[in-house]
Amino acid sequence: MRVSKANALKRWKGSQRRIGITGGIASGKTSIGKYIESVKNTPILDADMFSREALTANQTIKDTIINRYGRTIVDKENTNSKTINRAALGEIIFHDKNERIWLENLLHPIIEKRFEEELEKHKLSSTIVLIIPLLFEANFTYLCSEVWLIYCSLDEQYERLMKRDGLNKEQAKYRIEAQLPLESKKILSDHIIDNTNKLDLSYPQVEVLL
């Protein structure tokens, strides 16, 4: 996966501190974000939340996806509705790079717009946190004044992902390899939080940066 270094190094230059949190899947991004929220009472904007919002509430997006993949990705427990089964959708996009790119091209403009809307709402906040798993891949670094990478070892990443989502190793592998490698993200980030072990050991690193 190629990422433009010039785009990856773009940063927000305004007075508001915008902490962009990224990292690999199951690296602990959300946990670190929640910790910052608890100690700093800082607004949190989450790309995954905006993505879920689009898949559940945006009828145009839902219709577009269903028209492409058919009713195989509609929730089987509620087949009369147009509720998208995210697990079924994941099985498609994590096994086919072209389908993943198609879905990202569909969702990323929606997610970007939601970030811009929420940033405008919180423009008077001195600090705000943006949790964006595909921060570099989606070229969203321009939204952030600084980028923190939440890092963990590959073995730990596999273990957490398999346990969290009930995946086998092959399924976890497809998901991990769909993202830019953590080692590449380290080079493009401003700060690195090592979250390989217990979260309690990561919090002091966060405190130093805050």
Swiss-Prot record:
Provide the DPCK domain boundaries: 18-210
Annotated metabolic or biological route of this protein: Cofactor biosynthesis; coenzyme A biosynthesis; CoA from (R)-pantothenate: step 5/5
Extract the InterPro entries matched here: Depp_CoAkinase, P-loop_NTPase
UniProt superkingdom: Bacteria
> Which residues are ATP-binding?
26-31
Q: Which GO terms describe its molecular function?
A: ATP binding; dephospho-CoA kinase activity
Instruction: Quote the function comment for this protein.
Output: Catalyzes the phosphorylation of the 3'-hydroxyl group of dephosphocoenzyme A to form coenzyme A.
The name under which this protein is listed is Dephospho-CoA kinase
